[in-house]
Amino acid sequence: MRTEIADALLRAVLPPWAVGAARADDVSGPLFAVERALCEGAGPRREGEFTTGRWCAHRALVRLGGSPVAVGRGPRGEPLWPPGVLGSITHCPGFRGAALCRAGPARALGIDAEVDAPLPARVRDRLISTDEAGRMRPEVAGERLLFSAKEAAYKACSALVGDGRVPRLAELRILVEPGRHGPGTSGRFRVRVPALTVDLDGRHFEGRWKRSHGLVLTSCVILRPGTEVPRAWRPGTEVPTAQG
């Protein structure tokens, strides 16, 4: 897969006011010194995932209107972005990507990429509810879409709340909009979170998905209540925030 195709696949699941960068193959760098230290001792596969994920992050920062800076790692393994920037990194066999937006209408952003294949039965039974799975049939590997959507939503949630308050994947309920869900299609999804989850409201989750080129890609944005999200903003500029 060419880099421009990987870029287009990621762009297809992002809101118009977010940017991304992706590629299918690994690169050897460059990395900032602090980033290089984070992958010391890693095996070749993990080093390739990490290095290429950071390469995508640097490229996305430029597309957002900034300059490449070191993307560190937080206590939960999450990427650490510059002030005022929200983002997420994902990787799976044949795909690495990073997506960013500026804080404002958005409170958090998560993305996920998966190989479009059926979930192992033990994973499906543990994480996908009967109701969720029933909505996707008879589409082949529809449960992989549900799993990816949960991963994207989980990443967005974990950016807002501490480890002990993040809903488990099994607790996140994904409602995919009606329509075709098979390979070559795309659409939206909604997220339901546990009623007692502090600081999260499923009404403010915006999810997008695409199945193409043997992959499932998803994104989930948590929006700020009471904020009208613009259709787009010019990269590198500040975005309006809710008053009060």
Identify the function of each model-found stretch.
Residues 1-244:
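Core catalytic alpha/beta fold that binds nucleotide/phospho-ligands
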